Amino acid sequence: MSDSDPAANLDGLRQAIASGDPAARLRAMGCLRPYPAEDCEPLLLACLEDTTVLVRSMACSGLGYKPTAAGTRALRRMLDDEPDPNVRAEAANALARHGGEQASEPLLALYRRDAHWLVRRSIVAALADERDVPAGVLAELADLALADDDVHLQLGGVELLNRLRHDPDRGAAARARLADLRSSDDHRLAAAALESLLPQDPC
């Protein structure tokens, strides 16, 4: 096969990842974008076991963009077993990309038990961006974020409430909470709440 043959190139990436060298693994994972998820899955799963934090983090990111059932299970395991908060945060982001409906409950549970600021910020940002997160999860996560001492999480809570403004069951409560937040002592929080209550441009 020629070097331009996709199968030949994929074989080279497999060899690089099998080498166990962190630099080679990082380069190889960066070249997986053109390949289908089923070809990438075993390579990314292998890199989750690497001792290098950056390799594990990049493997999580790759699994987010190459969703498979095995990848989803592996990411959920990383939420529980991974010791490094940077990797847990990346796993949370990646799992959210598999779909807000299936990721929302595991990520809400992770928020409750993992107090690291980066993990929590990643969860709030990831679920705020997903369209199919159940309204009940958004509401509970907003309450948790707004109760946190971290103003960045509080601002994320405002964004979550904004997502709920027009929900038939939770919209009235979300709008009332946003109205209350306009009088917050923190001008950033008050401004974010005020902006959320302004009429939205339909364009």
What are these regions (language model features)?
Residues R112, W117-L118, A125-D132, V151:
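Alpha-helical adaptor scaffolds
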Residues L26, P42, S57-M58, R73, ...:
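Alpha-solenoid HEAT/ARM repeat scaffold
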Residues L26-C31, V53-Y65, E90-N93:
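Non-membrane alpha-helical segments in proteins
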Residues G12-Y35:
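Alpha-helical segment of the N-proximal tetratricopeptide repeat
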Residues D3-A16, A37-E49, T68-D81, G100-R113, ...:
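Amphipathic alpha-helical scaffolding segments comprising HEAT/armadillo-like alpha-solenoid repeats
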Residues P22-A23, E38, V53-L54, A69, ...:
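Alpha-helix N-cap/helix-start positions at coil->helix boundaries
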